[in-house]
């Protein structure tokens, strides 16, 4: 999210005038793509780390956990008294203690990104509380780690600082890029990927040109053929200019 938001408005206009399209490829669900992000001028998005895609409001594909899979995971988490939330296109749905247990983890995660002072309510301003968590439209379920066995036992897991994501098996950003291209009659040869984290590696390896942010993690930088400047030093805009996008 930080990557694309750092592109200055005039450069966004230049990109569009040159006929290029920009798609957000993120771990976030559709419900987490707030108006200020769409206002950047995105042509579409891949969400849920590859579970969902749309272009100009048209849904291209949407994979979710089945109702039975969701129930099994929710019961697994409740049995262990873990705090969690469901990520759906319709919204984010939290377990009762997610705010209490989530604040310290959010703080740690933000500190690792050079930010401080944010809480669950600030990071997830539209979180939905107090509803049934047995659903058939969840793309991912994220929960807070409290024991080493959590990470080992959780099925379909993708780990980050203090938390684990449980998602649809067999999906990642790379396969989603290919699937989106097939849906919009696009070609891999025309793609450029920008990433900064381990979860971006399949996308970087899929696209014709792959760029890691200088401020990104080691796995992303090792997977990319090109490394641009840090996000906070206009690395994205510099890469756009370098590759003739603006």
What are these regions (language model features)?
Residues 2-20, 62-71, 110, 168-182, ...:
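Short, acidic loop-to-helix structural element flanking the phosphoryl-transfer center
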Residues 32-35, 143, 176, 202-203, ...:
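Phosphate- and divalent-cation-binding pockets in alpha/beta enzyme and binding domains
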Residues 40-41, 49, 147-152, 206-207, ...:
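Short, structured coil segments at secondary-structure junctions
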Residues 82-206, 215:
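Conserved acidic, metal-coordinating active-site core of Asp-based
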Residues 7-101:
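Active-site phosphate-binding/coordination module
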Residues 15, 26, 49, 131, ...:
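Residue-level signal for inorganic ion chemistry
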Residues 42-50, 63, 156, 210-214, ...:
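Short hydrophobic/aromatic-enriched beta-strand-loop microsegments
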Residues 206, 210-246:
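Asp-based, Mg2+/Mn2+-dependent phosphohydrolase catalytic module
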